[in-house]
């Protein structure tokens, strides 16, 4: 019995050593996946990548869910959580109040909430502060834009999926280092935001102006990742920041393979 007890104590110690909760935050309630991590009157869901050693600082993707959803949806979504798990990224999925987001005007309550979420994540996981990315789908994408507009100095990459800020004339003090947006031309939920005279670069007008980019993209190309895309890319912006706009012929959905390909290009796995 004594040998068994010693063996069990060793096992418990090994598990504790591998726990993603830091030593200073060991009193925090264990959470992850479908179990919410509480922050104030709501919380968030988190999922580390497969094969993580429990110690190496992780890049973070904050993903805002669509309207009427909550954090477990992106965590369990094959094109969101399925991508981050395989590509070395810690997924953080906040819960919106009333299953929605406050992105319509500057000064969003959800900007501060996101900062509070990040502070809590740092207590539980070692993260790389220079690799904080944001994304979202539909209204969640609009919230990702809002956070990036208000806290761009904290954001390395914005991945927008089928949603923008409605007022593209807004002024953002600073934008993310890199902006990648995807939108369907046949979207009837959050209509494709054409510019004047059906200008297809309309979805990224705010960022093109903020980053002082040329009117026309540097280059265009067709590519595929489960479905076909037409890409426009700006890399000559005076801010030194790049913009990528991917267009597809479909409607309002999370484009198959798109986010995974973006993360793969950034290569957080070291492969």
Where are these regions (language model features)?
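Short glycine-rich catalytic loops that host catalytic nucleophiles or stabilize transition states
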Residues: 182, 245-250
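Short beta-strand/loop motif that positions the catalytic acidic residue
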Residues: 181-183, 187
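A domain-start/cap signature at the N-terminus of enzymes
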Residues: 18-60, 106-109, 135-165, 202-205, ...
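Alpha/beta-hydrolase active-site loop
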Residues: 105-125
């Amino acid at each position: 019995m004594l040998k068994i007890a010693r063996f069990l104590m060793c096992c418990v110690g090994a598990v504790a050593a591998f726990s993603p909760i830091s030593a200073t935050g060991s009193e925090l309630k264990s959470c992850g996946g479908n179990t919410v991590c509480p922050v104030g009157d709501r919380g968030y869901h988190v999922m580390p990548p497969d094969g993580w050693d429990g110690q190496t600082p992780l890049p973070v993707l904050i993903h805002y869910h669509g309207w009427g959803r909550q954090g477990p949806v992106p965590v369990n979504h094959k094109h969101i959580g399925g991508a981050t798990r395989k590509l070395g990224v810690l997924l953080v999925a906040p819960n919106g109040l009333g299953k929605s987001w406050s992105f319509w005007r500057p000064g969003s309550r959800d900007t501060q909430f996101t900062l509070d979420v990040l502070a809590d994540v740092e207590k539980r996981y070692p993260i790389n502060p220079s690799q904080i990315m944001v994304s979202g789908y539909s209204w969640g994408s609009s919230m990702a834009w809002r956070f990036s507009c208000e806290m761009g100095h904290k954001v390395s990459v914005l991945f927008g999926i089928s949603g923008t800020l409605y007022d593209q004339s807004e002024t953002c003090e600073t934008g993310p280092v890199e902006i990648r947006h995807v939108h369907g031309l046949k979207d009837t939920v959050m209509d494709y935001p054409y510019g004047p005279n059906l200008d297809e670069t309309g979805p990224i007008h705010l960022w093109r102006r903020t980053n002082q980019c040329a009117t026309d993209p540097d280059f265009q190309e067709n590519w595929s990742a489960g479905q076909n895309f037409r890409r426009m890319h700006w890399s000559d912006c005076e801010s030194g920041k790049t913009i990528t706009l991917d267009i597809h012929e479909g409607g309002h959905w999370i484009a198959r393979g798109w986010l995974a390909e973006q993360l793969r290009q950034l290569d957080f796995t070291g492969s």
